[in-house]
C-alpha cells in the first residue's frame, strides 16, 4: 500500500491507471475506520482492480456548532485497517492541500436536503458535494462506495452525480451492525455504558415498525409516532426526528407504498446517533 499526501501525485497515479484500462474502486471516508468502512473496502476490492481509500476530515461539512475538533482521528489505526483490506492507495491530504485557497465556486444542492439531517445542518450537503466533486476529480473512480447508514447522503450523491454526468457508479452498501444491532459508527466511542445499552432501542424501534408495515400498516404517521414513542419510553435520548419518506426522492408520503426509508436521529448527552431501514412495500 502506498500513502499519498498530495493532489498532484494522486491525480497522476489515477490518470495513469485509468489510461491503462484499470478499474478503480474508491472509498471516501473521514477516518477512524471501523468494520463498516472495512465492509466498503472489501466490496471495492471484490469489484475493482485498484482500491483507493481517502481519509480526510472535511471542514466544509461541519457547521459552526458541530464537532469538527472532537471528531475522532487515528491515522495509525486507519493505515492498519487499510492494509488489512488490501487497499492499494491511501490518499491522506491535509486541509491546506485540499483547500489551498478560499473556494471561488460552490455546489448548491437544492433537492433531498431539506429533511432528516439536512434540515438541521444547513450547508452540510453543499460541503459534502464540494469535497466529493474534488475527490472524484482527483481519484477518477470507476465505482465509489458509500454506507447506507447515511442514506440521505447516498440519495444526495446519486442525484448530484447524475446531474453533472460524473462518470462514476455509486454503490450503496448495507448498514453494518454490531452483534446486538447497533449501527457501527465512529461516534459510538462517545457513548457512556448506560447510553450504549439504551442505543440498542434505536434499531429495535425500526424493527418493530418494519414488522407493523409488513403486517399491513400503511399510515406513515402511525408508524413514525410508534417509533418516536418507543424511543422516548426506553431511552433518555432526545428524538431529533423519526420520519418516513419515499426513497431516494425523499418526498413526503402519507400512504406507505413503493420504496421507502424510515430514518431516526437521537441525541444523547455527547453524541447524536442516526439509523434507518429501507424497504419496498407493495
Curated annotation (Swiss-Prot):
Keyword line: ATP-binding, Cytoplasm, Ligase, Nucleotide-binding, Pantothenate biosynthesis
Binding site for ATP: 30-37, 147-150, 176, 184-187
Chain residues that bind (R)-pantoate: 61, 153
Xref: InterPro entries: Cyt_trans-like, Pantoate_ligase, Pantoate_ligase_C, Rossmann-like_a/b/a_fold
Top-level taxon of origin: Bacteria
GO biological process: pantothenate biosynthetic process
Record's catalysed reaction(s): (R)-pantoate + beta-alanine + ATP = (R)-pantothenate + AMP + diphosphate + H(+)
Entries under Pfam families matching the protein: Pantoate_ligase
List of catalytic residues: 37 (proton donor)
Associated pathway: Cofactor biosynthesis; (R)-pantothenate biosynthesis; (R)-pantothenate from (R)-pantoate and beta-alanine: step 1/1
Lipoprotein in keyword set: no
UniProt enzyme class: ligase
Membrane recorded as keyword: no
Function per UniProt: Catalyzes the condensation of pantoate with beta-alanine in an ATP-dependent reaction via a pantoyl-adenylate intermediate.
Subunit structure: Homodimer.
Family as reported in the entry's similarity comment: Belongs to the pantothenate synthetase family.
Anything else known: The reaction proceeds by a bi uni uni bi ping pong mechanism.
Name of the featured protein: Pantothenate synthetase
Amino acid at each position: 500500500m502506498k500513502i499519498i499526501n498530495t493532489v498532484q501525485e494522486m491525480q497522476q497515479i489515477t490518470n495513469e491507471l485509468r489510461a491503462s484500462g484499470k478499474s478503480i474502486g474508491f472509498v471516501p471516508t473521514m477516518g477512524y475506520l471501523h468494520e463498516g468502512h472495512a465492509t466498503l473496502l472489501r466490496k471495492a476490492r471484490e469489484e475493482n482492480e485498484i482500491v483507493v481509500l481517502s481519509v480526510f476530515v472535511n471542514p466544509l461539512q461541519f457547521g459552526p456548532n458541530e464537532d469538527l475538533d472532537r471528531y475522532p482521528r487515528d491515522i495509525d489505526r486507519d493505515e492498519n485497517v487499510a492494509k488489512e483490506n488490501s487497499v492499494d492507495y491511501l490518499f491522506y491530504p491535509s486541509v491546506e492541500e485540499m483547500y489551498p485557497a478560499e473556494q471561488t465556486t460552490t455546489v448548491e444542492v437544492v433537492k433531498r436536503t431539506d429533511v432528516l439531517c439536512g434540515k438541521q445542518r444547513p450547508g452540510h450537503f453543499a460541503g459534502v458535494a464540494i469535497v466529493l466533486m474534488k475527490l472524484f476529480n482527483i481519484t477518477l473512480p470507476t465505482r465509489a462506495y458509500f454506507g447506507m447508514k447515511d442514506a440521505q447522503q447516498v440519495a444526495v450523491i446519486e442525484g448530484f452525480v447524475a446531474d453533472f454526468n460524473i462518470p462514476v457508479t455509486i454503490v450503496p452498501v448495507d448498514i453494518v451492525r454490531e452483534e446486538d444491532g447497533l449501527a457501527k459508527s465512529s461516534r459510538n466511542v462517545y457513548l457512556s455504558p448506560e447510553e450504549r445499552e439504551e442505543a440498542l432501542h434505536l434499531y429495535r424501534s425500526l424493527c418493530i415498525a418494519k414488522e407493523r408495515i409488513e403486517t399491513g400498516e400503511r399510515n406513515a404517521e402511525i408508524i413514525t409516532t410508534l417509533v418516536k414513542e418507543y424511543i422516548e419510553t426506553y431511552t433518555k435520548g432526545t428524538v431529533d426526528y423519526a420520519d418516513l419518506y419515499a426513497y431516494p426522492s425523499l418526498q413526503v408520503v402519507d400512504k406507505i407504498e413503493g420504496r421507502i426509508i424510515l430514518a431516526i436521529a437521537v441525541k444523547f448527552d455527547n453524541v447524536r446517533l442516526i439509523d434507518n431501514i429501507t424497504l419496498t412495500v407493495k
